[in-house]
Design a protein with these regions (language model features):
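Conserved Rossmann-fold cofactor-binding substructure of NAD(P)-dependent oxidoreductases
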Residues: 67-82
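Rossmann-fold cofactor-recognition segment
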Residues: 54-70
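Active-site loop/turn elements of alpha/beta-hydrolase fold enzymes
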Residues: 41, 66, 148
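Local beta-strand N-terminus motif with an aromatic residue
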Residues: 58, 85-86, 113
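Catalytic loop of short-chain dehydrogenase/reductase
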Residues: 14-21, 94-179
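Conserved hydrophobic beta-strands of the Rossmann-like cofactor-binding core
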Residues: 9-13, 89-94
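Conserved glycine-rich Rossmann-like NAD(P)H-binding loop of the short-chain dehydrogenase/reductase
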Residues: 32-50
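Canonical Rossmann dinucleotide-binding motif of NAD(H)/NADP(H)-dependent dehydrogenases/reductases
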Residues: 2-38
Length: 179
């Protein structure tokens, strides 16, 4: 490859299996010379194949629930201990119980909506807040979140995830102002 990310260090959230966008991003980052920590929620780590990706990319796996400030604090402390300041963060996290359970948008379960909102969008704010408070980003570093066109248009089967992605994009704009 080209070594575009040689010497760059970061955290990649959300790789579950080889069908995950975060998985493919991690592979490319590794091919381009980056070093990173892989992270996902403990339950997702049990269901997924993240250890295989870690072995393939010579990366460390640190479980963290991205909705937990305590977990994020520990993850970022470990990243700082390993790398010093970091150059990139990828937030590739999303989940809707309403979609999984086949609930129609006009009949969504609000407790599930709240959970999906926290996982899919608010966690991005929590990740950036933790990075901000720990002053762990190198100058000109990048923080990325994956979104979907349903944040801008209606896709009925995407259900409340469209709402979640809209809020994710709003968080990116609002917190991005301060970086």
């Amino acid at each position: 490859m080209y070594g575009l990310l040689k010497g760059k260090k970061g955290i990649i959230f959300g790789a579950l299996n080889d069908q995950s966008i975060a998985w493919k991003v991690a592979e490319r980052c590794h091919e381009e010379g980056a070093e990173f920590i892989l992270s996902n929620a403990p339950i997702a780590m049990r269901m997924g194949e993240i250890d295989a990706l870690a072995q393939k990319t010579n990366s460390e796996v640190i479980g963290a629930d991205a909705t937990s400030m305590e977990d994020l604090g520990k993850l970022f402390d470990a990243a700082i201990a390993k790398f010093g300041k970091i150059d990139f963060i990828l937030h590739s996290i999303g989940m809707s119980v309403n979609v999984r359970k086949g609930k129609h948008y006009t009949d969504i379960n609000y407790d599930w909506l709240e959970k999906g909102w926290d996982v899919s969008a608010v966690s991005f704010h929590k990740v950036m807040k933790t990075a901000w408070e720990k002053d762990c980003m190198n100058e000109w570093g990048s923080i990325l979140a994956l979104t979907y066109i349903a944040a801008q248009r209606t896709f009925p089967d995407y259900n409340d995830m469209g709402d979640n992605k809209s809020y994710l994009e709003s968080i990116a704009r609002s917190f991005g102002y301060y970086w």
